Amino acid sequence: MKIFKGSATFSGIAVGRILYYHREISQVRQCFVSNVKKETADFEKARQKVAEELQILYGEESQIKRRQTALLEKGSFVRAVKSMIETEKVSAAYAVATTRDELSQTFRNLEEPAVKERIEDVRELSERLIAVLGGLSSTIFLGEKPVILAAETLSPGEILEMEKEKLLAVVTHQGSEISHASIMAKTIGIPALVDVEIEEDWDGLLAVVDGYTGTLYLNPDGELLKKYEERLKAEQEEKEELLKLKNKEAVTLDGHRISLYANIANLDDLNSVLFYGAEGIGLLRSEFQYLGRENYPRENELFRAYKKVAETMDKRLAVIRTVDLGADKQAAYMDIPEETNPIMGNRGIRLCLDRKRMFKAQLRAIYRASAYGNLAVMYPMISSLEELDEIEKITAQVKAGLREKGIAYKDIPVSVMIETPAAVMMSREIAQRVDFLSLGTNDLAQYTLAMDRQNPLLKEKYNDHNPAILKMIQMVIAEAHEEKKKVFICGELAADTELTETFLRMGVDGLSVVPACILPVRKAVRKSRREKE
């Protein structure tokens, strides 16, 4: 038996045979053509065909579909392909392959992680175009029995084109928790590991994937295999029991009800919010609209996304957090100056107040969309009342502009993310100025502990259960309640069922977690008491 450690991007257990998947990057021979007009027309037909494939594969509202469609319809990719066909008189397939390689190299040279993810978009789109131009199929066949798929890297399209019932788990070398493939694996609900050194001769070997510990067991011995088969059976039974809670309220044993909301990072997660029975969206991270692109999103693009959220949620609350860029989320086109310590630098609301044109465009989009549902707006990384003063001034300007143009909007609830020690100490004063508070425990923990949560050297020392953090949470809840304002927790700690009863006894009004954690947290609430016996 061999043991390999990776990083788990979605929990769960899988037992089965490995299918090693090797992606073939199309190598197209240089081929000159005499009829440039026909070759250009063939490229246009291929674009139309691929657009139809993307629609069927991803659906209308998928962010991946939108990004690839944007590449397909306009921008440097299409211009480069057409220019190469016309000036060098080469085949459309060769022009696509060459442009793919050049654009991918450009992205590799960038330091922004989110832009590097676009390499997958370019590669997948190019492979589809080349397949259509060559009359080939892009479907991936897994065989007769369900498998654990092992690959160097995977695109979301490759996962979607596989039969979901044939996928037990996904293990890759490249990727991250926020990579396209990891998100897609989470969406279809299968365990996923990244950062595992994959070898081709694993094909056909028996394996166990532990998505809780990030471990892959190759050729497990009988004792380990029996242990995991029993755990897998228990896990499946647990899932069936949890699904029975979908339409149940989150009420404690002593009759106290709290709200359970979902955290989502893009529009692809909207269906999961409804499927798992969340009461709404407690945190919509809006960074997905700003990362992985070449320029600022237009106001109408933002508006359409928020309108979709409002309409999908209908009467359910949906809290949109204004863009939280900086630190580990950089957008190259913004030309943010390099900082010695970006985690402590110009990020979140600080960057928004520096880039007022960007900030106002997002606020206009949010308020315009508010007419279509039950929205709220939330501001990240607040550390002073002066920031609230400036936000209120800008918001008043935005509302006045909408009124002048006769554009409908609602006076929606306003919230602040309490995620800095400064905000904790000023939580009473902040609560006096907003409608409710949300505790962002991820950043609050790292700022309180003075530890970068992504620093591997501090992994063993980083403890977000530290009593200092719990005392801060309790303080915020007490201070806000003195002002008759509700408090929600929307960081990773909200999904930690070991702390559910602790938070309930502190008096928290609601928890907001990733959709897949809604049911486990609901179960934990229903087994807890708010008052001590």
Question: Over which residues does each language-model region extend?
Answer:
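Conserved, well-structured core domains of diverse proteins
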Residues: 1-135
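Acidic, glycine-rich flexible loop/linker segments
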Residues: 1-23, 28, 131-134, 141-275
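An amphipathic alpha-helix/helix-turn recognition signal
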Residues: 45, 98, 177-180, 268, ...
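Generic secondary-structure signature for well-ordered alpha-helical cores
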Residues: 48, 52-62, 70-73, 77, ...
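Conserved phosphate/pyrophosphate-binding and hydrolysis machinery centered on Walker-type P-loop NTPases
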Residues: 71, 93, 119, 170, ...
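Amphipathic alpha-helical
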Residues: 109-139, 384-413
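Residues on a specific face of well-ordered alpha-helices
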Residues: 127, 183, 304-307
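Conserved alpha/beta-domain cores
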Residues: 239-533
